[in-house]
Amino acid sequence: MLGKAVHSLSRIGDELYLEPLEDGLSLRTVNSSRSAYACFLFAPLFFQQYQAATPGQDLLRCKILMKSFLSVFRSLAMLEKTVEKCCISLNGRSSRLVVQLHCKFGVRKTHNLSFQDCESLQAVFDPASCPHMLRAPARVLGEAVLPFPPALAEVTLGIGRGRRVILRSYHEEEADSTAKAMVTEMCLGEEDFQQLQAQEGVAITFCLKEFRGLLSFAESANLNLSIHFDAPGRPAIFTIKDSLLDGHFVLATLSDTDSHSQDLGSPERHQPVPQLQAHSIPHPDDFANDDIDSYMIAMETTIGNEGSRVLPSISLSPGPQHPESPGLHSEEDEAEPSTVPGTPPPKKFRSLFFGSILAPARSPQGPSPVLAEDSEGEG
């Protein structure tokens, strides 16, 4: 369990603050931006033998690199199978943190890690001052965040209609961006929570990476997770408590989530845009109501004048001319316009596009009908 706690803390900070106290061993960390703080306190009963300091010696406070301490507990699955006992001691004279792993078959691994003396790292927070509180098994919340993409940075937690707890992926709105990001949302009923004290419409947005780190530890230990929060912009406090350990995670929240939380859980937010309805698959009977004559006029206008074989208005940019015949035009080319090779006659397109939906009496069997009289009498 100690190794899992270190893995959970490694998702937040790059330095580990280790402090032996009279009431237990404290492991703390904070991220570089000071927006996330985590603390685990292992009670003396968690250890087979615990001594905070030798008689007449002051308590040591030290910090070490997270990567150095994480290398000792890198492979958790292997440690659970091979390690029987772990001994941790602080040597103030040599500034060394000694970690000994007593493995099976008498194998002993010793890690000497250098540390630095430091002041006590303590965040000021009070869960009792938060008006909203949720408590649920960590397994329930872990399954709720499972569908979210691993690259997602923030997630919004709020109370929707019917006192449903909603987890929704948060994306920053960009005015000059037309791309629509995929939105993932999970809803949990009130019956999934052991305690739910929050009013409808409240919502906070916090980092998902740190939240997943706490969930992975709490779920492996089969613990309940409590979430204490206030208005957006105020820190959210995540706590786990057991007879052998206490855990506190304090995460900063975004302060501009009021506009996103007003319609949290409302069905109108998830309705498709009206413009998208035009791209839906039409019903088979819709073809009978279409104005096929308008399509026929557009198609037969291109073949009405047999003298001027002009193709429909298709924008074709003139391609590069071949070098062997630059600027050469024969009389036949001037008398008859060039046609695109491989382009079928318009009559065949008409038969293909409209032959299956026209009545047999209106199928183009003979010559194409003339929709406009000849202009011979105007002379």
UniProtKB/Swiss-Prot annotation:
Cellular-component GO terms for this entry = checkpoint clamp complex
Which terms are listed as keywords in the entry? DNA damage, Exonuclease, Hydrolase, Nuclease, Nucleus, Phosphoprotein
Q: Which domain of life is it from?
A: Eukaryota
Signal peptide as annotated in the record? none
Under catalytic activity, the entry for this protein gives: Exonucleolytic cleavage in the 3'- to 5'-direction to yield nucleoside 5'-phosphates
Which InterPro entries does the record match to this protein? DNA_clamp_sf, Rad9, Rad9/Ddc1
EC nos: 3.1.11.2
Give the protein's function: Component of the 9-1-1 cell-cycle checkpoint response complex that plays a major role in DNA repair. The 9-1-1 complex is recruited to DNA lesion upon damage by the RAD17-replication factor C (RFC) clamp loader complex. Acts then as a sliding clamp platform on DNA for several proteins involved in long-patch base excision repair (LP-BER).
Q: How does it assemble?
A: Component of the toroidal 9-1-1 (RAD9-RAD1-HUS1) complex, composed of RAD9A, RAD1 and HUS1. The 9-1-1 complex associates with LIG1, POLB, FEN1, RAD17, HDAC1, RPA1 and RPA2. The 9-1-1 complex associates with the RAD17-RFC complex. RAD9A interacts with BCL2L1, FEN1, RAD9B, ABL1, RPA1, ATAD5 and RPA2. Interacts with DNAJC7. Interacts (when phosphorylated) with TOPBP1.
How is this protein named in the record? Cell cycle checkpoint control protein RAD9A
Q: What organism, scientifically named, is this protein from? A: Macaca fascicularis
